[in-house]
Amino acid sequence: MRIAIEITYLVSSILFIFGIKFLGSPKTARKGNLYAAIGMFMAIAATLLDQEVLTYEWIIIGAIIGSAVGLILAYKTPMTGMPQMVGMLNGFGGGASTLVALAEYFRLNPNYPVDTGLPFNLPIDTGIAIVLSLLIGGVTFTGSMIAFGKLQGLVTGKVVKYPLQHPLNLILILVVLAGGVLILLDPTNIPLILIITAISLVLGVLLVLPIGGADMPVAISLLNSYSGLAGSTTGFVLGNNELIIAGALVGASGIILTNIMCKAMNRSLMNVVMGGWASAGTEGPAPDSKARKGTAKSIDAEELAMLLESVSSVVVVPGYGMAVGQAQHAVRDLMNVLEKKGINFRFAIHPVAGRMPGHMNVLLAEAQVPYDKMLSMEDINDDFPNTDVVIVIGANDVVNPAARHDQSSPIYGMPILNVDYAKTVIINKRSLNVGYAGIDNELFFYPNALMYFGDSKEAMSKLVHEIKAL
């Protein structure tokens, strides 16, 4: 039986690896998701068949409740709520790792729940794994819950700063590590293990609270990596090779994705790890219009429809405003009606647009937009000078030309979509208010830029109607 279980773990690990590989391409993402799901089912089945399982009653109850909650969330959560869902699931993974580490500590402790006076010979490797599981799992759980709250509007999406932010975070981490050393020296110290857990939970809040709502894609990616690392350390606690491999895969892929997104924002990974993300700017009201250079020109739906009648290429840049307005279906209708007129229609996706990695891709895919229409910043940037019209929907800082030349700007050096190089730029926003970097977007006042004010869904639907009426 033991050999069969280990073989099953090996096969499921291979499925996880291929699953992640296939998830790297939109065309094979469904296959990758299926492979990973099959691998997880096999891993769960092998674990339940392990001879160390003494009773199945609570396992069955937990599986039924968890499956029911998962199904309800899957069916009830709209695509626009995916960032919140991902954040919450990351938290559940971290919370599970924390609980498993605590449970294993108390299971191994001969003086719990009754002090027997027996020596507690906690193996060093197991003790280290337990402390790391508590630290990483605790940070992941509370950090992910704060991220969920920010995305859901339950917690302010603004940057929240507090005195001695970085030193305090560093001190708390060192306290946890020092406590871990003391646990190895005296494993019977139950209050200390609870203190380590509590500090880890507090640390998660303090690390994520300073992160602004617009920087959630990086935070979600990093927390996803943490959840994988927490799972991997829990695998060491339990001596489960499958959990070690699966957690390592998630942790490594999450770190790689986080690093890529940091480069896309011209920020350092260490700044994110220490909870200092978004320190360059804060949300706030629009500055006095007198400080702006020039005057923004506007266009209405009828005029824009007439403009689009005479072009041959259109690129749409989606942003968080499209997600908030749930305008992806209206944008797809715009694509369909313009392509019928022979217009080359594409999408330009910035790596950190939205509130989670791949947020815009998920929304557009849900609206049945073909994958080959979604181009990355690297693929589309050189083609903007040859583009007749760019329509920016709810994006702001990722198209601000100040990032290229204004060294005093908080977004200076951040790679952006060079939409200002196009012949005409249409910006759909509710107002001229600033983005999350807290600065004006000079693009709004460029001679080739026109503001198309209004809610994204309503504005795109009205535009489609006007085009059809021509």
Task: List the predicted regions and their residue ranges.
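Transmembrane alpha-helix boundary signature
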Residues: 47-60, 72-83, 98-117, 187
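Transmembrane helix-loop junctions at the membrane interface of multipass transporters and ion channels
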Residues: 103-118, 185-191, 218, 225-246
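Structural signature of hydrophobic alpha-helical transmembrane segments
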Residues: 1-13, 50-68, 126-141, 187-199
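Mobile "lid/hinge" segments at catalytic clefts and subdomain interfaces of large enzymes
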Residues: 212, 227-270
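Membrane-interfacial segments at transmembrane helix termini in multi-pass membrane proteins
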Residues: 249-311
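Structured cytosolic domains appended to multi-pass membrane proteins
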Residues: 292-470
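Cytoplasmic-side transmembrane-helix entry/capping segments in multi-pass membrane proteins
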Residues: 30-39, 59-62, 81-93, 159-170, ...
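C-terminal ends of transmembrane helices
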Residues: 15-28, 67-86, 144-159, 203-216, ...
